Amino acid sequence: KSKGKKERGKAAPSIPQEARLFLSDETSFSLEWNDSFLRAYPKAHSDLFSLINAKPLRVLSAGICLGEAKGKDFIPSQELALSTALTPNAFPSVELEWEDAIKFLKKEALVLPSGIDKGYVLVRYQRLPLGFVKNLGNRANNLYPQEWRIRTGYIPEEIKLFLGR
């Protein structure tokens, strides 16, 4: 593909120093920019990625998307939040109650408890990561993907967990 006017001659942004700290085993991943998205690829599979990238194949998804560069900001991705490679304390986190977790999954606005640092915060329910919000102090912007949100108005009164045997 030919590059558009804006993209022509533009160098890839430098990799943010803190991005390596997002991964629990940073030495086993190589970081690369794919357009404005920073992706982490397992070094164990680097030969395979090189082979795939050399062919005219359309790769839908590979590695872990750590986030997106928008201007001077680096916005962490939902993939990173759900990845087992995420360092547990890489971001400030807050534990949500059932009602707030459902609000988050519906992509509704959340009000976080005071004392939480401003910036990107990992929200959890029962210690499991759900995704990121950007804490602005008086409110938090929900970064949950629009296409993944819960769209039904029905919320069960009782939580039923189905565990396999």
What are these regions (language model features)?
Residues 1-165:
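Polybasic, low-complexity RNA-engagement segments
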